[in-house]
A protein has these predicted regions:
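Hydrophobic helical membrane-anchoring modules
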Residues: 1-13, 155-156, 178-253
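N-proximal low-complexity "stem/linker" segments adjacent to membrane-targeting elements
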Residues: 1-36, 43
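Acidic helix N-cap motif at the loop->helix transition within catalytic regions
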Residues: 25-29, 56-65
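Residue-level signature of catalytic and energy-coupling elements of molecular machines
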Residues: 27, 34, 90, 105, ...
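Acidic donor-diphosphate engagement hotspot in glycosyltransferases and nucleotidyltransferases
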Residues: 30, 58, 87, 111-113, ...
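Short beta-strand/loop segment that forms part of the nucleotide-sugar
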Residues: 43-54, 75-77
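A conserved acidic beta->alpha catalytic loop
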Residues: 51-60, 106
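Acceptor/aglycone-binding surface of glycosyltransferases and processive sugar-polymer synthases
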Residues: 71, 75-93, 98-101, 107-183, ...
Length: 253
């Protein structure tokens, strides 16, 4: 096993982080997939699981899956703080020159990480888009509307903006300072990175049905709005508006 110093790596290297909220059925499987994908890259790596206040055995399962490997660690929120805050914590916790994030629900094939990694040569941000989404109908409708709003309000250029399969050069976050606490954070990072002139590539990736468990970020399970809370929708719209005002004013720091 490579020696792990806990210090930022020089040159090539990648931090892979996964936000997790009540993912006890998936987290060990995803850590195993991540290990295999990262080993295939042939560079130093680390894995960070960002536990967003899980009430199940997510942390326990993570610790059991990572015994003896100091390259894998858990960063925990004391309470559920939302998807945007989980991403911000993951970015802040990353120690390697490249930062990659994906979901912890098994909907993405981490074998595609190699293709994303290859695109970094000509890019500072590699943003994937789902070739064929395997999500419930209402979620597809919501995502279509969200992407359409993002396209109109922020003048296009982004395909499948909320796809959780992205690679960033860590140094871009010396300038790009995300403030969003919800899912708007993906759009915020891409918009600010574009404003600073960072290079971006987009590639298609496979998408699958959720491996186990239920949708957990910003959801509830019953009623007409079967997967999105009204409060979460309001928060998203407010933060979209705030981001548009922020970019219009040039407040990008």
């Amino acid at each position: 096993m490579p020696e792990y110093t806990g210090r930022p790596s020089e040159g090539e290297g990648i931090s892979l982080f996964m936000p997790a909220f009540n993912e006890e059925q998936n987290v060990a499987f995803m850590i195993g997939c991540a290990r295999n994908a990262l080993d295939a890259l042939g560079v130093p790596w680390e894995i960070v699981i960002v536990d967003d206040g899980s009430s199940d055995g997510t942390v326990r399962e993570t610790m059991a899956a990572t015994v003896g490997d100091e390259r894998i660690r858990v960063v925990s929120h004391g309470a559920n703080r939302g998807f945007g805050m989980a991403l911000r914590t993951g970015i802040e916790s990353a120690r390697m020159p490249w930062v990659f994030y994906t979901d912890c629900d098994g909907q993405f094939d981490l074998d595609d990480l190699g293709r994303v990694w290859a695109e970094r040569v000509d890019a500072d941000v590699v943003s994937a888009y789902r070739r064929r989404r395997r999500d419930p109908g209402l979620r597809l409708v919501y995502s279509f509307c969200y992407n359409l709003i993002a396209w109109i309000v922020f003048f296009g250029g982004f395909k499948d903006v909320d796809c959780s399969f992205k690679l960033y050069r860590r140094s871009i976050f010396e300038k790009v300072k995300p403030r969003s606490t919800c899912g708007v954070i993906d759009l915020e990072i891409l918009t600010l990175a574009r404003g600073f002139g960072f290079r971006r590539r987009q590639i298609p990736v496979l998408h699958r049905e959720r491996r186990a468990g239920t949708v957990s970020f910003e959801t509830f399970r019953k009623g007409f709005f079967a997967w999105v809370r009204i409060g979460a929708l309001t928060e998203m719209l407010e933060q979209l508006f705030a981001l548009r005002v922020r970019t219009w004013r040039g407040d990008v720091g």
